[in-house]
Amino acid sequence: MIVTLTDQPFEPGVLVSAFCAGREETGAVATFIGLARAEQGAARALELEAYPGFTDAAITEIAQGAVTRFALQDVHIVHRVGVIAPGEAIVFVATAAAHRREAFEACDYLMDYLKSRAPFWKKEHGPEGPRWIEPTARDRTDAQRWDQEA
């Protein structure tokens, strides 16, 4: 399992290829790649803040829980911090399992956590200046469904 926070751009295709290499006992790999977007051209950049040692530990803990909950063989998470331009990759999540359902569900579970509960602080830089961004009601609802299924 790998959890990485980085302030450097990354190439998702390279990560997918590396994650899939040599997996003779794996039946399924699911991936998610999140990109920074400009809402109708409004955002010039997204800024993500994290506490080193705390944020990555929290993500590692939820990833370890996902390994157990979904019988995963492996997990790889890369999450950007710092200033991210529209179109750049923010997050990469890959899950490996014996079967597709577990890989898909685990990837979804991890993204719901990263989107709504992971200790990141998000600021959007737009034409009217910076503004802090909170998880949306939908983000919270998506994450809560996993609490009900536990």
From Swiss-Prot:
Residues 136-150 have a biased composition (Basic and acidic residues). Pathway: Cofactor biosynthesis; molybdopterin biosynthesis. It comes from the Bacteria. Gene3D superfamilies: Molybdopterin biosynthesis MoaE subunit (3.90.1170.40). Disulfide bonds: none annotated. One of its GO terms (molecular function) is molybdopterin synthase activity. Its EC number is 2.8.1.12. Residues 124-150 are annotated as: Disordered. GO terms for biological process: Mo-molybdopterin cofactor biosynthetic process. Keywords: Molybdenum cofactor biosynthesis, Transferase. Substrate binds at residues 35-37, 99-100, 115, 122-124. Converts molybdopterin precursor Z into molybdopterin. This requires the incorporation of two sulfur atoms into precursor Z to generate a dithiolene group. The sulfur is provided by MoaD. Heterotetramer of 2 MoaD subunits and 2 MoaE subunits. Also stable as homodimer. The enzyme changes between these two forms during catalysis. This is Molybdopterin synthase catalytic subunit. It comes from Caulobacter vibrioides (strain ATCC 19089 / CIP 103742 / CB 15) (Caulobacter crescentus).
